[in-house]
């Protein structure tokens, strides 16, 4: 039977529940268990797809096209699994589904209430996460902080699930903060005690407490928390601040967290703890030698979480070369043709990531022009690819006013236009081209060198696509279309072979990169940037 682990948080937000859940998932996977993980978000948006990046950070896309919380990126990268649409559940999605059922008459005229209708819907989605993946263990992170009014239906649902499935199949992990009071010169357990008291008042007794702390805990502190919170002493797990997130699984393993979970849930682990690969990765991360400077030109750079997966993918790509990646955050609204060199002259590579809307798009085009004309390694993603074709059309083909129909509906040369199937769609949420799609790579191209194969699959998130009316013109003037949909209809990758490294893709490769397995485009981009740096 599938076992369920729930990760809650108390005292303050941003304690690292997601990293704790991810690290535990990694430990259990390395013991030979089939693990999946999900996030419950208490906000009323159906999904984060239409939320501002300034509010929410990036939208992470799964293979099956779900637009999800950025924490799912952490989950996938840490555990090295591919998640699905059941891995992110919002209050908005739950309420929306319940209300649709009510309108259909599914409740036979009954009064629809938070208990049992909302809680039953939440529990149903809990079970689907396990059923859809045949998982041995489902780890669920509950967003927010214990006591938040928005989280109460989720807390009630996970309380009920223990009775539904049996105590032996359910486990609760609670993350808290152990603050250091400088004036007193000591760490205080009282916030943890009150947080657990709040959780117990809601009917949940934690089995494990993970304590976030700046300093090493004494055994007396652990004993005190165990006594006041009514758990075993070995079930108080210290999680110290670390220089690298990749240290956290090792910290938890050293305190036998995986053994405690396996014993408590009576899991059949196939192996003893195996973290050799993880230790090798951490050794590389802790011994980087030199840096490569990448100019990331975007419109949301004031909130770096808007590009979280891109940043992580760049870091992954630096590891094989033992290089740290120094990201130069460049606000595209400030870049022009005239001042581009001021921002980009000393970078080793230029990356233009995805985005939506007209604002700051001209600055991205100026950055792309600078990369093309000065032979600086360039990598464009999604909108970055679209604007690369726009820049080429304007400045090489001479099509003055060429643009994307999304950004300039009146453009005389719509190089980028709506996908045909998008023409009559009015709703914004969940209606883009989303998820994993195949791509055919053209022989003899940089793309083929990068991937080393003719067919690939990548994740997408876009509504607009390259306009095939301009295909022949671009190719006749030196831009190569190196990747298309298998039927040849949709342009997925472009490149300029006369440049040392100029490649762009319509898809989002950052969603498939792993710390121990960098995505091939990112790796090739960093390799080209390193060569450019060495030849300066």
Curated annotation (Swiss-Prot):
CTP binds at residues 13, 148-150, 188-193, 224. CDD domains: CTPS_N (cd03113), GATase1_CTP_Synthase (cd01746). Mg(2+) binds at residues 71, 141. It catalyses: UTP + L-glutamine + ATP + H2O = CTP + L-glutamate + ADP + phosphate + 2 H(+); L-glutamine + H2O = L-glutamate + NH4(+); UTP + NH4(+) + ATP = CTP + ADP + phosphate + 2 H(+). Allosterically activated by GTP, when glutamine is the substrate; GTP has no effect on the reaction when ammonia is the substrate. The allosteric effector GTP functions by stabilizing the protein conformation that binds the tetrahedral intermediate(s) formed during glutamine hydrolysis. Inhibited by the product CTP, via allosteric rather than competitive inhibition. Gene3D superfamilies: 3.40.50.880, P-loop containing nucleotide triphosphate hydrolases. L-glutamine binds at residues 54, 355, 383-386, 406, 463. GO terms for molecular function: ATP binding; CTP synthase activity; glutaminase activity; identical protein binding; metal ion binding. Coiled coil: none annotated. It is an enzyme of class 6 (ligase). Keywords: ATP-binding, Glutamine amidotransferase, Ligase, Magnesium, Metal-binding, Nucleotide-binding, Pyrimidine biosynthesis. GO terms for biological process: 'de novo' CTP biosynthetic process; pyrimidine nucleobase biosynthetic process. SUPFAM superfamilies: Class I glutamine amidotransferase-like (SSF52317), P-loop containing nucleoside triphosphate hydrolases (SSF52540). NCBIfam families: PRK05380.1, PyrG. Catalyzes the ATP-dependent amination of UTP to CTP with either L-glutamine or ammonia as the source of nitrogen. Regulates intracellular CTP levels through interactions with the four ribonucleotide triphosphates. This is CTP synthase. It comes from Staphylococcus aureus (strain JH9). The gene is pyrG.
